[in-house]
Design a protein with these regions (language model features):
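Alpha-solenoid helical repeat architecture
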Residues: 15-19, 47-51, 85-89
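Eukaryotic acidic, Ser/Thr-rich intrinsically disordered low-complexity regions
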Residues: 78-118
Length: 118
């Protein structure tokens, strides 16, 4: 799926707004490969509303955004990670894999801040 991210990128707006979980998963997969600040909050909300498999991949997309957008969009990424955490905190069951990925995303941002101080 990720190998076609560049080819399918032009369909991202359509995939994001789709009622089909498969198409939303395709959008998430594209954003895992090609992070876009426009969709950070959309990804953060997927953590709350999608089934665990899809929500996990939304968290991975946020982790990749933290790694790739931290220099240009650190505040937006931080806000999205915070929203994802809030959504996860409201969930009846917290997927340990999602928790781990979001913790790593937060560490990525903090690492960048610490590197900038040195």
């Amino acid at each position: 799926m990720r190998s076609i991210a560049l080819l399918a990128y032009s369909m991202l707006d359509e995939l994001v707004s789709s009622q089909s979980v498969g198409q939303r998963l395709a959008a998430i997969s594209i954003l895992e490969s090609i992070p876009n600040p426009k969709y950070l909050l959309w990804l953060a909300h997927r953590v709350a509303v999608e089934k665990p498999f899809v929500a996990y991949h939304a968290a991975v997309a946020l982790l990749n955004a933290a790694r790739n957008l931290r220099a240009s969009n650190a505040q937006e990424v931080q806000k999205a990670i915070e929203v994802a955490w809030e959504n996860l905190d409201r969930a009846e069951w917290k997927d340990p894999a999602q928790v781990s990925v979001l913790e790593n995303a937060k560490k990525e941002l903090n690492w960048t801040k610490e590197k900038g101080k040195g």
